[in-house]
Amino acid sequence: MTTFSAPEPDFAAKRKHLREHALKLRQALPVERREVMTGQLARHLDALMQTLAPRSLGFCWPYRAEPDLRDWVQAWLTGGSGRIAALPVVVERHAPMVFRRWIPGVPMALDRHGIPHPAEGEALVPEVLLVPLNAFDDRGYRLGYGGGYFDRTLAGMQTIAVGV
């Protein structure tokens, strides 16, 4: 039998410090630099999507200076028939998120952080999910905001997660 214990306080404090530091660095980037970097990311995503060829794609509304991929997602939607984009929705705290279909102009609501999401719609599971991150380590492990929403969501979802 395997038992798990809570991470040592040192580890949790280190992660919190790294999260805050990475977020400050990202937010300190000039808007023009972030736009250039988002364009570079979009070109990499173009190549990746040609390889993966998903019919459905989950992405996140930009939050706290994250890459703004909305224009890229709109272009991806128009690049092939039957494509679906989806945004995450926190239905219940400490539970996995659900994804609802997004198209430009769909009625939106704000979550408790002020992040827009589709106000209603059926839940779907995107084939590819663009997951925001603040940093990652040398093994590719993601450092997010610390709420565990994506960890819980990805644990129960069959999708290809791509850190952005």
Language-model segment annotations:
Residues 2-125:
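N-terminal active-site beta-alpha-beta segment that forms phosphate/nucleotide-binding
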Residues 139-164:
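Membrane-associated lipid acylation/remodeling enzymes share a hydrophobic transmembrane-juxtamembrane segment
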Residues 122-132, 136-140:
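Helix-hairpin-helix/helix-loop-helix acidic hairpins
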Residues 104, 134, 158-159:
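Short loop segments at secondary-structure junctions
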Residues 86, 130, 160-164:
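Hydrophobic/aromatic beta-strand patches that form the interior of the parallel beta-sheet core
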